[in-house]
Every structure is written in structure tokens, then in C-alpha cells.
Amino acid sequence: MATSSSSLPDPYGKPNECILQLDGPDARHFLQGQTTADFQKAPVGATVYTAFCNPKGRVLADALAIIISDDTVLLRGRKPVMEALSAHLTPFLAFSKSALRATQWTVVGSGPSSGLQTEPVSAQLIEENDAVTAVVINRGKGFIEYWQGDASVIQPDPEDVVPLARVDFETARARVESSTIGAYLPQDLNYDLNETVNFTKGCYTGQEIVARLHYRGTPKRRLYRAIIANISETPTPGDGITNAEGQRVGSIVNTLPTGEQLGVLIEVTPDSTHGPLLTREQGQALSSLEACHPVTDQSMG
């Protein structure tokens, strides 16, 4: 790992990622009522995966949060998604003793490294002059995610840098894109299976819908990883996926270009995975289908 007194230069910083900073004595309380995660019980330095939903339980934004202190929380997400989220939260912040602002922090992934723990751990906070200037996050499977402020003192080796999209793909972490804001229930993205949703924390926007599906319903779709070989046209997140009969059974969630192949995270009905799947718009076949998490609910029936 190399070190520097300057911030990460291009091509390290990825403008598609944005970090918001929530400050104030009500920061945790505000997030407790707006997101699917339990911010009240999480300790300082914890990594908290969470989602913001609308009243219908649809996901407006996903975020990886780091609790910097009792009064400060950083939230990382796709830049256009976080911009829309900031506008959505503005009316609610008027009644909270907290303020939300965009930062100039950069985000980059690195790995995989066989020397790292396979399971994620709490974030490492890097400080200068009593201020947090960088965050190092073990994403699991040998991948690291770095967040860096203007005056940071740490950066990864350039040879180890990988797109954050690869980190998300390899660790099966579905992301909300600008074209899929409000499109999915948390269960469609397996957020109920990877600790993004806490079902005991109490009320939050959309909680009634999300909890009802968890306790009384059957998730219709689940998250899978797949490959599209010899791509002629790259599908867009939100594009449909069909079975051999042309029936829509799900959609593209995220994409990862890898040369002539395209890695994709998709949400589809579990029953449809027993037969051929095609991209609806391009008619391209999906292969190497793999469930992102073990699914034990009744949706497998």
C-alpha cells in the first residue's frame, strides 16, 4: 500500500460514487426513522448497510454508512442516486437537529487479496489532527473499499485498484442505479438476507410493507449473478429479463463489463432459473447463473 499527503488522483476517484455527510445530535435518530438499518445500536466505527424506502416499501437508495461519531455519519451511494436522495430527505431534515451535505471524498476499490479476512469487519478510521480523513473497509472475499477526504494520508497500490462495480459483483451487493430508483422491494435485492434490513428495530418509512412481505408473504424475486457472453449491446439496469416463452421474469440490476463478457446482477423469479433466460431488449442469453445467497423462504416452492 502506498501513502501520500494528497487525495486520490484520477483514475482512482470514481465520480459515479458520492459520499454524503450527516451531522448533528439527531443524526442517528434521523436515520433510524428513515432507513432499514438499526443506527441506534451500531457502535462508532461500524459499517452499516442500509436502504431508504418510499411509503410503498420500494427502495429509493442503498447506502453503505460509516458511523464516524455519535453526531456524524457518512453515507456512500451512486452519485445520481444520492443526489435524488438528498432532495427527497430535505423536507424531513427541516424537523431534525441534523444537516446533510455532499462531500468531496473519493471512493475506490482494491483486491482481491488472499491475505485479507473473507468476512467483512468494522471500518478502520484514519485520523489526522483529530479529524477522520480516510476510511478503510474490508468488503469481504479479499476486497477493500477506500474512502478518502481532501487531506487524506492513505491510498491503495495502483496495481490493486479495481472498479467498485467489481467489488459489488463479487460480494453480491446489489446497488440502486439512477434508472432503478423506486423499482425494487428490499427482498428483490436480497437486502433481507444480507443484513441490510433489520426486522426488529421498529418503524421507518416503508417498514409496514417490507415487514408484511417478510412475515406473511412470499418474495416473488431474488438476486442472482450471471454472465452474458459475446455482448453486442450492453443492457441498462432496469431492462427486462424473459424466459424462453418471452414472459418477463425479472430485470437487470447492475452490470460489470469484463472484456467481451458482461457480469450482471439480476433479480428474477426463482422458478425461472430452471430454464433459459434472455435479456428482453437485446435477446442475449444469460449463463453461469448463481444464487447470490441461500434462499430458504417459500419463494423456492
Regions found by a protein language model. Give the residues of each.
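Basic, glycine/lysine-rich polyanion-binding surfaces/domains
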Residues: 1-301
